[in-house]
Amino acid sequence: MASARAASSANSAAASVREARRLETRARLFDAALSEISQRGFAAADVSAIAAAAGVVRGTFYFHFPTKEHVLIEVERNEETRIISELGDAKGDLASVLAQVVQHVLRAERRLGDAVFRDMLGLHFSSTRPVEDELTQHPLAQFLVGVIGRAQDEGQVPADADAAELGTFFLTGLFALLSTGAHDEALLSRYVATIVKGMERR
């Protein structure tokens, strides 16, 4: 009985070590991929170079990330999670909250750098985007569903409007603007105002 417990404990410890190594390898690959994309751009980023920088063979990259696109998907999910954490329970009317979202997305660009940020946004309009990556499943989209839902409760947005659809429209338009390099404060403010006007109850 004691030997069985000892064997079980040893197996558990070995599994924990393997998992820790797996996560460490994945993190190295992720960082190496971001560095490669930053330096060469997404299209030119080379998986063999990424694997070499992480100290693993090429096949190991695909074990952790089925495609290069999956790296950008993870970058975006991480940034979106950070943004909604920073926004918290954002207060204010619909226009002010959407304006805050825009500012936080711009901060994400400064953190990531132009190359990674634009390639990340460009993925939304690419035929190579993994089919499982639906915008409505993103943390930021879910956050916007809640924001728009509150606006519906307050009578600012029609109750029969689809909050998920409206949130997707907002993010898709914003990403399209930013992916072209549009960062003019007045332009982005007009974009928010136009979107809100389109959402509001007539």
Go through the PLM ranges and name each one.
Residues A43-A44, V157-A161:
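Short, charged helix-capping/linker segments at alpha-helix termini
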Residues M1-S12, Q100-R111, A141-Q142, G146-E154, ...:
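C-terminal peripheral helix-coil segments that are non-catalytic and often amphipathic
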Residues F65, V71-E79:
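Alpha-helical DNA-contacting segments of helix-turn-helix folds
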Residues M1-R40, A44-A53, H70:
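Basic, helix-initiating cap at the start of DNA-binding domains
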Residues E74, S85-D114, G167:
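Hydrophobic alpha-helical connector segments
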